[in-house]
């Protein structure tokens, strides 16, 4: 008599493999990867892209709304403070030493999908 558990286990394993996926690769940016504003694009490409395009050093990827959500909940003043003073892997001034608060606000808005 055929053991019923073997075919059921096989079906379960096939479904498990078929439904699994790399969650990181599934979270693709939802918007453009370069700002429409040329001056913001220049700042982004020079100072932000190297970390935020790839998610280097736990930086939230540009356009990854899910990764940005808990940061945005802290509010713009906290995000600006972290950007200006540095926070965890984020270097002070985000390596944009000629940026001002308005520039950082625009960059954060773009990268967070806002």
Language-model segments: what does each one mean?
Residues 61, 82-114:
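Axial heme c-ligation environment in periplasmic c-type cytochrome domains
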Residues 19-23:
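Bacterial signal peptide processing site
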Residues 44-54, 107, 111:
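The canonical Cys-X-X-Cys-His
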Residues 39, 43, 67, 78, ...:
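Extracytoplasmic/secreted proteins, especially bacterial periplasmic and envelope-associated proteins
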Residues 28-50, 65, 69-70:
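Post-signal peptide N-terminal segment of mature Sec-exported envelope proteins
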Residues 1-8:
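Bacterial N-terminal signal peptides that target proteins for export
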Residues 53-81:
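Gly/Gly-Pro-rich "capping" loops immediately C-terminal to redox-active cysteine motifs
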